[in-house]
């Protein structure tokens, strides 16, 4: 037994869920960064045929023509089509996501989850343990790799 109340366990579960969302959203954003900035390959999700929140929201906001074109480019990239240049395709997708504010939207969603995670901890007294959890949360959001 942890000695925690149901309310405390629920709060920690909520904190963990929102922390996980922040981590995943940051991972999605980093995938659209430049390799030089993060020191590892980028655009992995797109190349694997996975649509992340920045792409999904950009597709939703885009004109029908732009969305259809980017879907074709992303599909060709994922299928390793010999008819496209992978670097140019990646740059086109990145530009599309920036044009339709997909990255900014993901950052706004991270901030919503950050606030909810901190709110979940509000039932606990201020101490080094709570501070450590908040530090972990901030790291998940502010990491550059």
Where are these regions (language model features)?
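All-alpha prenyltransferase/terpene-synthase fold signal
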Residues: 1-145
């Amino acid at each position: 037994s942890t000695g925690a109340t149901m309310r405390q366990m629920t709060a920690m579960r909520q904190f963990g869920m929102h922390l996980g969302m922040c981590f995943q959203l940051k991972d999605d954003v980093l995938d659209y960064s430049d390799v030089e900035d993060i020191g590892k390959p980028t655009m992995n999700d797109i190349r694997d045929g996975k649509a992340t929140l920045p792409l999904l929201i950009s597709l939703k906001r885009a004109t029908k023509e732009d969305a259809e074109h980017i879907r074709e480019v992303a599909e060709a990239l994922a299928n390793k089509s010999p008819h496209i240049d992978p670097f140019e395709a990646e740059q086109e997708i990145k530009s599309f996501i920036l044009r339709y504010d997909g990255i900014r939207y993901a950052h706004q969603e991270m901030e919503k989850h950050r606030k909810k995670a901190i709110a979940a901890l509000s039932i606990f007294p201020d101490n080094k343990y709570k501070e450590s959890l908040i530090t972990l949360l901030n790291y998940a959001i502010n990491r550059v790799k």
